[in-house]
Design a protein with these regions (language model features):
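Short glycine-/aliphatic-rich beta-strand segments at the starts of folded cytosolic domains
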Residues: 122-134
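C-terminal regulatory domains involved in ligand/effector binding and gene-expression control
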Residues: 1-69
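Polar interaction faces of repeat-based domains
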Residues: 118
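Positively charged, aromatic-enriched nucleic acid-contacting surfaces
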Residues: 56, 66-83
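Short Cys/His-based metal-binding microdomains
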Residues: 99
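Glycine- and acidic-rich phosphate- and metal-coordinating loops
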Residues: 52-53, 84-94
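N-terminal cationic and glycine-rich segments that engage phosphates or anionic surfaces
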Residues: 107
Length: 134
């Protein structure tokens, strides 16, 4: 299983600031608390778009951006890199210039891709603990 070490990366595109947070998740129960922490850390952001993959469970959210322009591109990058047990949140501070649907897809994709380029990828082996008593 390929996963990541926690990391973040910031880019500015047409005056909008995009902050990508990549987070390792141990279980699905962590997702809501990590999202809450990020919203607290980046108060006042315009959007908190995210996607996660945990085993066979995948989900994304556009958080008010036009449908399919934020969460799905984030998820696509995670899937294309065969990552698992990962939550990716891209925080956007609107800079006053509308990017259009295509521009948003490119911006969110670039944000996650740039963050991944600066993130340590970990190859985890799944093991089972077997206890034998005599």
């Amino acid at each position: 299983m390929k996963t990541i070490e926690d990391s973040n990366y910031t880019i500015v595109i047409n005056k909008s600031k995009f902050i990508c947070e990549l987070l390792y998740i141990n279980n699905q129960d962590e997702i809501d608390s990590k999202l809450k922490d990020i919203k607290h850390k980046y108060k006042g952001a315009t959007h908190y778009c995210y996607a996660y993959i945990y085993d066979n469970n995948k989900r994304f959210n556009d958080d008010g951006e036009p449908g399919g322009t934020a969460g799905m591109p984030i998820l696509n990058v995670l899937e294309n890199n065969n990552l698992n047990h990962v939550l990716c949140v891209v925080i956007r501070y609107f800079g006053g210039i509308k990017l259009g649907a295509g521009g948003l897809v490119r911006a969110y994709t670039k944000s996650v891709t740039s963050c991944l380029e600066n993130t340590k990828i970990i190859d985890k082996k799944e093991c089972q603990l077997i206890k034998i008593t005599f």
